[in-house]
Amino acid sequence: MRQRAFSNHIAWSAAQLKGDRALAYVAIRSTDPGAKVTYHQVFIKNFFASVDEAYSAADEAVSRIITIDARSNPIFSFSDH
């Protein structure tokens, strides 16, 4: 699992098995006390055969985050996610 700290947020990779497919996510939490985690599915057109593959894809997505906006949305260095 890859994790990165930004000025007001922390982001990390996440994955989930749904049926026979795994999905990749970027999880984001504000550093404000009591903030909730939000999950953003990445590579939404792709399904992965295993959770490990989904984590690898999510790790890549986390590494490409430029910043996180005020609504806890990640801004990536590429536009297809």
Name what the model sees in each region.
Residues 1-25:
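Short N-terminal "domain-start" leader segments
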Residues 17-42:
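Short aromatic-glycine-(Arg/Gly/Cys) micro-motifs in beta-strand/loop hairpins
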Residues 38-53:
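A short, exposed loop/beta-hairpin motif centered on an aromatic-Gly-Thr core
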Residues 49-63:
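Acidic helix/loop or adjacent segment enriched in Glu/Asp that either coordinates divalent metal
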Residues 60-72:
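Short arginine-rich
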Residues 71-81:
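Short, highly charged C-terminal tails/helix-capping segments
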